[in-house]
Amino acid sequence: EICVFAVCTSHILTSVSNYYHELLPRLLPLCHENGGNIIAMQVENEYGSYGNDKEYLKFIAELMRDCGVKELLFTSDGPQDDMLSGGTLPDILKVANFGSRASASFRKLKEYQGFKAPSMCGEFWNGWFDHFGEKHHHRASAPVVSELKNMLRSGASFNFYMFHGGTNFGFTAGANHDKCYQPTITSYDDDALLNEWGGRTRINIMPSARSF
């Protein structure tokens, strides 16, 4: 209900438009088209986990183009039917987010791609975020290395999520709500390969990557 209300309320879309018209012109000089290193931009973020309003997604994509973005656009969602059907557009590249079962996830992604395109994991979850009061999440390196090798052998592209664990300043960390309020800590450590202050944490993952 919240998603429907947010999408259908015109003053919210007006606010989004105003924000994009302020934000995107600042990024355009950094885009590849203008000699920068931004080669692609994402439309929404895992929208299929919350809604399926295609008109809203089209609005966001068209707004980005209207603001001067010429780079590749893509959507990023979980590798499940409801998420990929709800969060994607037919003429825009789709990538999937996951931390395991890479082969199965890419097969599901191809069912929705609609055109020939490279396989990409937008968020490869090599770790996980922490809520206040919880034990720090730590993922064993072996399954991370195994999935990494599978993706490299298949020729897929991926982003580590996270490669460097930075900081969520102020109240930007966000929260979840699973029967109770679960605020996220200000550290975005996420059991990343590089921790919050830049130290290396997973010495056995990088040699595996270099072998390819």
Label each residue range with its predicted role.
Residues S10-S17, K54, H138-V145, I205:
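Non-membrane alpha-helical structural segments and their capping/turn regions in soluble enzymes
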Residues D66-C67, G99-N195:
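Catalytic-core region of carbohydrate-active enzymes that cleave or remodel glycosidic bonds
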Residues E1-C3, L57-E62, L89-V95, H137, ...:
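Aromatic- and acidic-residue-enriched segments that line the glycan-binding/catalytic groove
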Residues S187, D191-F212:
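Catalytic cores of secreted or luminal carbohydrate-active enzymes
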Residues L23, M41, E123, Y161, ...:
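Conserved, mostly hydrophobic/aromatic
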Residues I2-S10:
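Catalytic cores of eukaryotic secretory-pathway lumenal/extracellular enzymes that build
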Residues H11-P90:
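Active-site neighborhood of glycoside hydrolase catalytic domains
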Residues D77, K94-N97:
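N-terminal, Lys/Arg-enriched amphipathic/low-complexity engagement segments
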